[in-house]
Design a protein with these regions (language model features):
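Short S/T/G/P-rich N-terminal loop/turn motif that feeds into the first structured element of a domain
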Residues: 1-232
Length: 232
């Protein structure tokens, strides 16, 4: 695999069949760096198959979490390799930053995107997650459609916002949004009411959508990226 500068992955690339996403709780900015450096080192020396297209590590701006976002051509090989590589990564992380906890990996497929090709390169990635009370692929898509309809009805997009990419988990229970922003301040300003994020009846309906049991938003910065398959 080739090391690359920490640039944003191409979320819409057509050969990305699945995204494997995992969240880690680090607790401090220093432990975030230790976790990412350890995981990055373990992956760089691994025999990674060409079906891994990209792997990106993001650190939350509050110093609490790390997110890994891996693009693969197919889910089966992704999950198989992730189990093998996961042991090496966990050992490396435990040696460098003991006590870090991780959530189970979740498989997603991109469903829809709202592109802003004129937007500048993102300095902040806002990850939103929604979990439902059971599997229902139609409900996942209906929720995303509602949100995108609400965003498209805005009179003018927020100046700091970029493209937004909505994913559905392959088990039918979750939705993940990957939103690009110029910087953290732009997103904070928008959600505080000086922009359009969170305004309007469509967004209100999305928040009150039946069956939602958990939802959250976290702001991240891209820290490390590795490209496979000749990409990134």
């Amino acid at each position: 695999m080739d090391q690359s500068a920490p640039v944003a992955p191409d979320i819409t690339r057509p050969d990305a069949g699945v995204a494997i996403v995992r969240e880690f709780v680090a607790g401090t900015a220093g432990r975030q760096r230790d976790l990412i450096d350890a995981a990055f080192g373990a992956v760089r020396v691994a025999a990674v198959p060409p079906t891994l297209l990209s792997l990106t590590w993001l650190a939350s701006t509050d110093g609490e979490k790390v997110l890994s976002y891996a693009q693969w051509t197919a889910e089966d090989e992704a999950l198989l390799f992730s189990r093998v590589l996961g042991t090496s990564v966990q050992q490396a992380v435990a040696a460098r930053a003991p006590g870090i906890t991780a959530s189970p990996a979740v498989s997603y497929r991109r469903y829809r995107s709202a592109a802003r090709p004129d937007a500048p390169p993102p300095g902040c990635i806002v990850i939103g997650t929604v979990e439902f009370d059971g599997p229902d692929a139609d409900r996942q898509r209906a929720w995303i459609d509602l949100v995108l309809d609400a965003l498209e009805s805005e009179p003018a997009p927020d100046a700091g916002g970029g493209s937004r990419h909505f994913h559905v988990s392959t088990d039918g229970t979750r939705v993940l949004s990957y939103a690009e922003w110029i910087d953290e301040a732009s997103h904070l300003e928008a959600v505080a009411g000086d922009g359009t994020v969170g305004d309007g009846s469509g967004v209100a309906r999305a928040r009150a959508f039946p069956g939602i049991v958990r939802a959250g938003v976290t702001r991240y910065r891209i820290e490390r990226a590795i490209a496979g398959g000749g990409a990134l």
